[in-house]
Amino acid sequence: MSTVQVPKLNTKDLLTLEELTKEEIISLIEFAIYLKKNKQEPLLQGKILGLIFDKHSTRTRVSFEAGMVQLGGHGMFLSGKEMQMGRGETVSDTAKVLSQYIDGIMIRTFSHADVEELAKESSIPVINGLTDDHHPCQALADLMTIYEEINTFKGIKLAYVGDGNNVCHSLLLASAKVGMHMTVATPIGYEPNEKIVKKALAIAEETGAEIEILHNPELAVSEADFIYTDVWMSMGQEGEEEKYTLFQPYQINKELVKHAKQTYRFLHCLPAHREEEVTGEIIDGPKSIVFEQAGNRLHAQKALLVSLFKNVEELS
């Protein structure tokens, strides 16, 4: 660890990327790249991370559990349905009890307000592994992937096409923080949350970022360096069949990507539904870096875990 310093973060928790400065984000990315090359650094020897899941997961659960093992610690799976919190115990009581047993909490749930309360009432770090409003760990890995490809955020255009969901929200805040140009194209009625857009625009004024919310996918991807999409049906929305027709013009396909730079790269947070939000030709083609992106969840989260745990140690 002599060549790379553990980033010092001015926060106990990570609930949204709004809580981090541009400098902290860059430091986390550089630290994540270091950990990617040095997988078995035992920086969290003996530490226990509680993993609370109210939603199904592949990447989030496996990457956090594997990350804790590689860092010398342990990830403890906790099903939200099986905990007393699922039977009426308050979030506040749960936070205080878990703070007596373990060293940190990662939670993947529905209500962002519950995660905020969990963080407020706990004395240990709390990481938002996904809520209906935000997915900061995914956005941090996305920034790492972009940084590895181009080594800068200045002058980079990221185009997000599809549903203005939690992933889109976190990408808006992330892009605003690091000074990127981000365009979002959604059907009318599926725009990202207005309050989050306003926050991103306010941050962009300070950082020089450019944020655009559009309804024209061709305009959104015009001269883009990166094109990003997500599933049209998020968990719990599977019955909204009319969305398929409405979203069809927003499919990432060979015609749409002609408007981007020839050197563009394709991103997707996964899981993907081929021939819906993206064609197999694109996601399985040479421009796609979705599996490198998925792999970076592990490394970005390890950097975050070490930084948050070390900060709490120094403060205690």
Curated annotation (Swiss-Prot):
Superkingdom of this protein's organism: Bacteria
Family: Belongs to the aspartate/ornithine carbamoyltransferase superfamily. OTCase family.
Designated gene of the protein: argF
Pathway the protein acts in: Amino-acid biosynthesis; L-arginine biosynthesis; L-arginine from L-ornithine and carbamoyl phosphate: step 1/3
Annotated coiled-coil segments of the chain: none
Catalytic activity: carbamoyl phosphate + L-ornithine = L-citrulline + phosphate + H(+)
InterPro entries: Asp/Orn_carbamoyltranf_P-bd, Asp/Orn_carbamoylTrfase, Asp/Orn_carbamoylTrfase_sf, Asp_carbamoyltransf_Asp/Orn-bd, Orn/put_carbamltrans, OTCase_ArgI
Binding-site residues for carbamoyl phosphate, renumbered to this chain: S57, T58, R59, T60, Q84, R108, H135, P136, C137, Q138, C269, L270, R297
Keywords, alphabetical: Amino-acid biosynthesis, Arginine biosynthesis, Cytoplasm, Transferase
One example GO MF annotation: ornithine carbamoyltransferase activity
Pfam family, one: OTCace
One GO process term, biological-process aspect: L-arginine biosynthetic process
Main location: cytoplasm
Job of this protein: Reversibly catalyzes the transfer of the carbamoyl group from carbamoyl phosphate (CP) to the N(epsilon) atom of ornithine (ORN) to produce L-citrulline.
Localization annotation: Cytoplasm
GO cellular component: cytoplasm
Species whose genome carries this gene: Bacillus cereus (strain ATCC 10987 / NRS 248)
Protein name according to UniProt: Ornithine carbamoyltransferase
Enzyme class: transferase
SUPFAM superfamilies: Aspartate/ornithine carbamoyltransferase
